[in-house]
Structure formats: structure tokens, C-alpha cells
Regions:
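Catalytic alpha/beta core domains of metabolic enzymes, predominantly
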Residues: 1-121, 126
Length: 126
């Protein structure tokens, strides 16, 4: 749960800073969970990302874990939906399949809406 996630986050943050690390150099994993069998936990993951973002901490993780075990034609849809929601909650980066065209288009489009990238008609080609 998020109390446990944030407890570990606080411990790691404090230990890193004790050793001279800048919080900006630390990356926290919200632990993306498999939807199959853990559907009720998905919003907690997004809330954890928001908590990291509110603390101005970086977040990253294995995004495609959410769709593990699903049919191949469904995985890109689920991964794209989750990355959009995670980015809007402040996800800094993610471990993703760069060959998944739908996912990459979603990430690039979210970057436009978040004003991380200047829109151009050719933005999908970059």
C-alpha cells in the first residue's frame, strides 16, 4: 500500500542524503503491478506516482508489468492507457518497449499536453 511505499521512499531518501546524494539523483519505483489479479491496486500505483511528484522526486519503473500475462493484442492498449495516466500524475520515466508504436505515440502526445515538447505537425516523427 502507499503508506508502505512512502515509508520506504522516506528511508531511501534520508539514507541517500546522508551519503551526500541530491534528491534529484534518486529515482523511485512505484512498483507497477499486474492488472490480472491485482486490478484493485492500480489506482494506488498512480497515487504513489503523484505523491513522488508532489515531493519533487523522480519516478520510474517497469510499466509493462501491468499487462503481463495478457494477450499480445491487448498489451499495447493497456500499456498506452497506463502510461498516459501515469504521466499525468507525474511519472518521470518508465521502462517500456520502444518498438511499441502505439505506446510511443501516446508518450509523445502526452509530452505535448504536458508542455514538455513544442507541438509541430511532425512531432510523431521525432
Amino acid at each position: 500500500d502507499n503508506d508502505e511505499r512512502m515509508g520506504y521512499c522516506q528511508i531511501l531518501l534520508e539514507r541517500g542524503m546522508e551519503h551526500g546524494m541530491d534528491p534529484a539523483d534518486l529515482w523511485f519505483d512505484p512498483l507497477f503491478l499486474v492488472v490480472k489479479g491485482m486490478q484493485d491496486k492500480q489506482m494506488e500505483v498512480l497515487e504513489a506516482i503523484k505523491m513522488f511528484s508532489d515531493m519533487e522526486l523522480n519516478s520510474t519503473g517497469g510499466l509493462s508489468n501491468n499487462s503481463n500475462g495478457m494477450p499480445k493484442h491487448i498489451r499495447p492498449i493497456m500499456d498506452s492507457a497506463l502510461v498516459a495516466m501515469a504521466m499525468m500524475n507525474g511519472l518521470t520515466s518508465a521502462i517500456v518497449n520502444p518498438c511499441d508504436l502505439r505506446l510511443m505515440e501516446t508518450i509523445k502526445s502526452c509530452d505535448i499536453f504536458k508542455n514538455n515538447t513544442l507541438y509541430a505537425d511532425s512531432y510523431l516523427e521525432i
